[in-house]
């Protein structure tokens, strides 16, 4: 039986939703690659698969919408979030790639991590560093919030007008990122979630690095890993 391709989840471009988000689960670990877009511009977040691993679907979407890619934003530098950066840069050579300075020491290890999964090494690239605070990528605007703990330089991208935040592997539906990998730190992660994410409005939609979307208010009430009795999940 032939399997149907995975379809992206989409928000629709409307007057009340000027910066929708298309989500594509791609790559060996089904990383959510998020495309934030307006009528003309696009921001690609965490391209975790190569051309054969789902990135082509992202490229086809960008072409179909006739979007101009303004930047690639990496929430952190684990291999499953950066696998498609080099092929994306081949298609859009002038597009900058941004990551937190705190994660740069992980890059060399991450480039080789695919071999542990029987995959070719991640092709090298050189990211520019991005600061915490308001930022613009063409007509796309939001705020970088540093959310370390899963990695030393993890970051999230908050879009206040859209009531949405892209959290990478910091916060998931009813879970948080694992902290047993090199550079992980559970107290830092829970503190970042509480101070940088749980301070957002309760109706903020959460677009995580893996799995389904959720909302800040729901995670504040129901997430079992951000409570006084904290434990470290090993699922991601």
Feature names for model-found ranges:
Residues 42, 49-50, 113, 141-146, ...:
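Metallo-beta-lactamase
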Residues 14-65, 156-168:
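Conserved beta-strand hairpin/beta-sheet module of binuclear metal-dependent hydrolase folds
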Residues 1-18:
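N-terminal amphipathic/basic-hydrophobic helices that include classical n-h-c signal peptides
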Residues 50-55, 59-138, 221-229:
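Active-site HxH/HxHxD metal-binding segment of metal-dependent hydrolases
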Residues 24-26, 125-127, 146-148:
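Short Gly/Pro-enriched turn/cap motifs at secondary-structure boundaries
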Residues 22, 73, 143:
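Conserved Rossmann-like nucleotide-binding pocket used by diverse enzymes
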Residues 14-20, 114-117, 139-140:
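Short Pro/Gly-enriched beta-strand edge/turn motifs at strand-loop
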């Amino acid at each position: 039986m032939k399997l149907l391709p995975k379809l992206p989840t989409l928000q629709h471009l409307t007057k009340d939703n000027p910066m929708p988000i298309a989500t594509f689960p791609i790559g060996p670990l089904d990383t959510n690659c998020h495309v934030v877009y307006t009528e003309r511009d696009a921001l690609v977040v965490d391209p975790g698969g190569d051309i054969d691993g789902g990135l082509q679907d992202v490229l086809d979407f960008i072409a179909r919408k006739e979007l101009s890619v303004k930047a690639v934003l990496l929430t952190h530098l684990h291999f499953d979030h950066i696998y498609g950066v080099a092929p994306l840069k081949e298609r859009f050579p002038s597009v900058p790639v941004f990551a937190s300075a705190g994660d740069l020491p992980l890059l060399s290890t991450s480039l080789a991590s695919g071999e542990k999964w029987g995959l070719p090494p991640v092709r090298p690239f050189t990211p520019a560093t991005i600061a915490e605070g308001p930022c613009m990528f063409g007509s796309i605007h939001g705020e970088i919030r540093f959310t370390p703990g899963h990695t030393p330089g993890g970051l999230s991208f908050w879009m206040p007008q859209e009531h949405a935040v892209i959290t990478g592997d910091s916060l998931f539906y009813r879970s948080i990122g694992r902290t047993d990998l090199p550079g992980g730190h559970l107290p830092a992660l829970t503190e970042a979630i509480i101070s940088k994410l749980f301070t957002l409005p309760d109706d903020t939609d959460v677009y995580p690095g893996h799995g389904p979307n959720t909302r800040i208010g729901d995670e504040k009430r129901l997430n079992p890993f951000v409570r006084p009795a904290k434990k470290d999940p090993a699922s991601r």
